[in-house]
Structure formats: C-alpha cells, structure tokens
C-alpha cells in the first residue's frame, strides 16, 4: 500500500513538473531544480533522489527533451548563502559570499572547497533559466532573484567586487516556480534546531547507500567532517555549531520573524 501511495505522489508531482514545463514549450531554456531544507544533490545518498526518491525526475525530464540540472547547495545554510552557492553552481567559479556579509557573520568569504565548473556557464540575460524550488528552495530562488537585480555594497558602502554581487543582472531568470514553500515563514521552524527524530538515522543511511556520504556543506563556517569521524559524531557536532545562534542559518530564515 505504501508503495502505491508513493507511486501516486510521484505521478502527481511529475505531472505538476511537466505541466509547468509545458507552459514554456516555446523555448528550451534549462530547468534548475533547487532542493529545500536537508536536501541533497545527485552525487549524494546513493541512487535515492531528492527529486523523485526511487524515481529520477531529472532523468524523466531529460528523456522528454528538457535540459535539466539538479543543484546541490547548503541544506542548513541561510538563503543568502544558498543563493550565492546556487549562482556559482549554475554559472561556475569560486563562491564569494560578499565582504560585508562575511564580516557581519564571521564566515569565510571564499571557502576553498566551494568552487564550481558550472552547470550552465553561458547563463546570462540572453540565455536565462527556469528555476523550480521545493520548500526552502523557493525562498532561496527569491533571494537569488533579488541579488541578481541589486548591486550590493559592503559595510563601507563600497560596491562588492564580485561580478555577481557588485553588478545588476536583469533578465537572467525566465521563470520561478515554488512548491510547498513557506514564503511567509513558519511557526514550526524550531523543529530545525531541536532536531528531527529520524534525521540522524536518515543521514547514516545515506552514508551506506553510495560512494558519497551526506554533507552539511558548511565550509563557510569552517565546519568540515573530520577524518574517521562517524556520521553520529558529525551530526552531533553540527547540532552544537555556534552558527545556530546567528541570523545566517536556516532556522532564522524559515521563521516568521526572519521571513519579514
């Protein structure tokens, strides 16, 4: 019965995706899938996909002629950090969170482990993309849209030096679609910090499902999994990270106060 329910849910979700893409059948602009809280990329969790579970929605869309990419950004990071990572994952290059933002929250502005070749390097106003975000992914896309359209200044009121934050890049996004996104925040955001009962087991399961374990992607905080560190120790150390006490983390962004 559970298997049938999963198939029904998958069929409805896939129908929704195809419905969205059919609205833009006049163009072949790429589709970028953006995961939500505790999400993961195609190279993590073995063959179990965030977008489709045992089924592979990206592959289904590709088989139907669409150019599709799955983003893999910080599952616990703030929408600012996630939007920055999303930009560089699509365009390519060294992640730069901005001088002002990095100084404000005490994070590493350009973490060495976060440089990307680019899913779609020719991305610009002449080659825009469709963005589909699930849950927190919808908020992240809205932040990306804002940052693309705004020239950001650092704490000294000097324009940020990165091509992304320092410039205005209108027309780079063809469409935005959000699925189950808490656009006005949620009163359930404390679940993020108090812990979800199955979360540790879920992450541990991911570690044995494939060649790549689940990663919290918090290099900007100087947080990495230690050599020979167990999944349990990695998870518990993450729970105690000082970043949770700041406004540069997922728990703040999904709260009612943080989303104002």
Identify the residue ranges that each predicted region occupies.
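Bacterial N-terminal signal peptides that target proteins for export
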Residues: 2-12
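Glutamate identity and glutamate-enriched acidic tracts
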Residues: 3, 43, 58, 67, ...
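N-terminal signal peptide c-region/cleavage motif recognized by signal peptidases
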Residues: 20-22
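N-terminal non-catalytic accessory region
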Residues: 25-132, 136-200
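Helical cap/lid subdomain of alpha/beta-hydrolase-fold lipid enzymes
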Residues: 146-147, 152-260
């Amino acid at each position: 019965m559970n298997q049938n329910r999963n198939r029904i849910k998958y069929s409805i979700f896939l129908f929704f995706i195809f419905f969205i893409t059919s609205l833009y059948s006049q163009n072949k602009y790429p589709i970028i899938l953006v995961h939500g809280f505790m999400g993961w990329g195609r190279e993590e969790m073995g063959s179990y996909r965030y977008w489709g579970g045992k089924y592979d929605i990206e592959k289904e869309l590709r088989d139907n002629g669409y150019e599709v990419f799955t983003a893999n950004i910080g599952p616990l990071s703030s929408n600012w950090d996630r939007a920055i990572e999303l930009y560089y994952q699509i365009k390519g290059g060294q992640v730069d969170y901005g001088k002002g933002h990095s100084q404000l929250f005490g994070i590493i502005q350009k973490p060495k482990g976060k440089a990307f070749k680019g899913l779609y390097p020719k991305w610009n106003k002449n080659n825009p993309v469709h963005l589909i975000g699930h849950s927190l992914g919808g908020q992240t896309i809205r932040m990306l849209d804002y940052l693309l359209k705004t020239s950001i200044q650092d704490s000294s009121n000097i324009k940020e030096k990165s091509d992304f934050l320092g410039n205005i890049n209108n027309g780079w996004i063809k469409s935005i679609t959000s699925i189950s996104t808490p656009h006005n925040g949620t009163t359930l955001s404390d679940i993020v910090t108090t812990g979800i009962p199955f979360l540790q087991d879920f992450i541990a399961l991911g570690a044995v499902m494939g060649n790549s374990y689940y990663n919290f992607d918090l290099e900007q905080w100087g947080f990495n999994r230690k050599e020979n560190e167990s999944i349990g120790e990695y998870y518990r150390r993450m729970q105690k990270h000082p970043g949770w006490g700041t406004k540069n983390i997922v728990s703040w962004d999904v709260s009612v106060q943080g989303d104002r």
